[in-house]
Amino acid sequence: MFSRNAASSRAIPVEKMIEQVEKNPVIPIHWGKAQKGMQAYEVLDWETAKLCECTWLLARRDVIKNVRLMLGCGLHKQIANRLLEPWMWITVIVTGNEGAWNNFFALRCHHEAEPHIQKIAGMAREVRSQSIPQKLSA
């Protein structure tokens, strides 16, 4: 079983969030073609993928503009920040026993896993393989 916690966008000032989203936005690493089923086995050609990436970033620009408009109306950050979430990175702390991690890696490092979680799971597996656990005294 995992125990996890993630940083809350509700706690971050909107302008700080906007700055993060402008400087280092999340951009998809896999632009899959539309097809039946849960997996996009085929990817868009390079030119179409670049067009999608540009459109993704234009959507970010439009959302930032609209967030600032709503802030001008007095909207609280807990709502305004929600609109920025598709482009933001978050910090998550996860703990689990060996069985939980082995199960997670079996499912999420699998070739049919969603590409973005597959990438993150692979990175976590690599870090875990290099970790040397230390028993702490009470």
Name each model feature, range by range.
Residues 1-138:
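A conserved ligand/cofactor-binding region detector
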